[in-house]
Curated annotation (Swiss-Prot):
Entry keyword set: Ribonucleoprotein, Ribosomal protein, RNA-binding, rRNA-binding
Encoding gene per record: rpsC
Species, as recorded: Mycobacterium leprae (strain TN)
Keyword Ribonucleoprotein: yes
Family: Belongs to the universal ribosomal protein uS3 family.
The keyword rRNA-binding is annotated on this UniProt entry: yes
One annotated GO biological process: translation
Stored CDD domains: KH-II_30S_S3 (cd02412)
Name of the protein in its database record: Small ribosomal subunit protein uS3
SUPFAM superfamilies: Prokaryotic type KH domain (KH-domain type II), Ribosomal protein S3 C-terminal domain
NCBIfam families for the chain: rpsC_bact (TIGR01009)
Length: 281
């Protein structure tokens, strides 16, 4: 199920919240229809603004719309003219007072929706789909909060006669783990061969108890020792397989003589050195 379902809906109420927050008794269907119309209006009129998310809150006589965008200057416009136009269109649509909040996205490379929009824009500009996917993966993996990413393109890739799907993945993307923080984005690229769908999954770590899990860093000494001894190698054993120096009677005898010889010149507290003496005639 985790491979097919939308990650946001799969984790709704567990690690993710609702993007539309309001209560309605008899006007539920009308409010849902208005929310869909608001999101469609913002997505069709502001393609170049890089809108990552739209959150809607309602009260009795007011609608609050939060727009998370990577390019707030395009949404605001010169002297706020574009923001005033958007607010007027929303008030005409909802017939209520609209409070418009424009929020800037700090890391666009770690937002799945913006990554999907970037790949789709490159596909529309006749860039090879494999190159666009790899470039998006490389730029996303440079972000410190990204632990894994998967990018998938579906359609007539490269102008082929038969449509297919291809994806690239780097790092971990646990889609079935409910505590995993998975960001999901979807966008369509309009090309001369038809539409190509782009899906992006970004894994940003686990959420335990409402807080992001902090990965423990290994000590420097242990990491250094691990680098010095390559993996898969064992210390060489003397003698035949299954035998050591003291594994036989002769070996035990030799080992006992060597240990006795080493203990002659050493005491518990000091080391005694024996100098050669010359006999006098």
């Amino acid at each position: 199920m985790g491979q097919k379902i939308n990650p946001h809906g799969f984790r709704l109420g567990i690690t993710t919240g609702w993007k539309s927050r309001w209560y309605a008794d008899k006007q539920y269907a009308e409010y849902v229809k208005e929310d869909v119309a608001i999101r469609r209006l913002l997505s069709t009129g502001l393609e170049r603004a890089g809108i990552a998310d739209v959150e809607i809150e309602r009260t009795r006589d007011r609608v609050r719309v939060d727009i998370h965008t990577a390019r707030p200057g395009i949404v605001i416009g010169r002297r706020g003219t574009e923001a005033d136009r958007i607010r007027a269109d929303l008030e005409k649509l909802t017939c209520k007072q609209v409070q418009l909040n424009i929020l800037e996205v700090k890391n666009p490379e770690s937002q799945a929706q913006l990554v999907a929009q970037g790949v789709a824009e490159q596909l529309s500009n006749r860039v090879a789909f494999r190159r666009a996917m790899r470039k998006a993966i490389q730029s996303a993996m440079r972000q410190p909060n990204v632990k894994g990413i998967r990018v998938q393109c579906s359609g007539r890739l490269g102008g082929a006669e038969m449509s297919r799907s291809e994806f690239y993945r780097e790092g971990r993307v646990p889609l079935h783990t409910l505590r995993a923080d998975i960001d999901y984005g979807l966008h369509e690229a309009k090309t001369t061969f038809g539409r190509i769908g782009v899906k992006v999954w970004i894994y940003k770590g686990d959420i335990v108890g409402g807080k992001r899990e902090v990965t423990a860093v290994a000590p420097a000494g242990a990491e250094r020792a691990r680098r010095e001894r390559p993996s898969g190698t064992r210390p060489r054993r003397s003698g035949a397989a299954g035998t050591t120096v003291t594994g036989t009677d002769a070996g035990r005898a030799v080992g006992g003589e060597e240990s006795a010889a080493t203990n002659i010149g050493h005491s518990d507290d000091s080391v005694v050195t024996h100098e050669p003496q010359i006999a006098e005639s």
